[in-house]
Regions:
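Solvent-exposed, flexible loop/coil residues
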Residues: 5, 26, 51
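Conserved short strand/loop->alpha-helix "switch" segment adjacent to the catalytic nucleotide/phosphoryl-transfer site
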Residues: 30-56
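STAS-typified acidic loop motif
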Residues: 19-31
């Protein structure tokens, strides 16, 4: 991983399982879920289910709130943790969990279901990451 957020924020240094450019638009979340099928042999069902849900939320946020014309998904499957990053080429959005209203629950789910997560606003894009224990 080239000086990615994982390395800077969490000390994670491991081989990427994959990195994909998903494009933007309403179908980006579906494309992300299809890409995650590549992990079915490597991840336990409940972990993969959580990763799939949280990736869907992050990709949807990137498209809906940041107006991202393109979204990048990167996943590292380690022996103890799964590290996921979603980067958007749009503007930054307020990445704070909100529990009010009918929408805005994506980051609440990230906060509750992941073991760690964070955000980096970088020139030209925003990167949101999370980690889930495999145990």
């Amino acid at each position: 991983m080239s000086q990615g957020l994982a390395e800077r924020q969490t000390g994670w240094r491991g081989p990427e399982s994959f990195r994909r450019q998903l494009g933007g638009g309403p179908s980006a979340a579906g494309r992300a879920r299809r890409e995650l099928t590549a992990l079915e042999a490597d991840l336990e069902g409940p972990v993969l289910d959580s990763v799939r849900l949280l990736v869907t939320e992050l990709v949807t946020n990137a498209v809906r709130h940041a107006g991202a014309p393109a979204v990048e998904l990167a996943v590292v499957v380690g022996s103890r943790r799964v590290h996921v990053e979603v980067a958007n080429a749009g503007g930054a959005f307020a990445a704070r969990p909100r529990e009010d209203g009918d929408s805005g629950w994506g980051l609440v789910l990230i906060d509750r279901l992941s073991d760690d997560w964070g955000v980096a606003d970088e020139p030209g894009h925003q990167r949101v990451w999370f980690e889930i224990e495999r145990v």
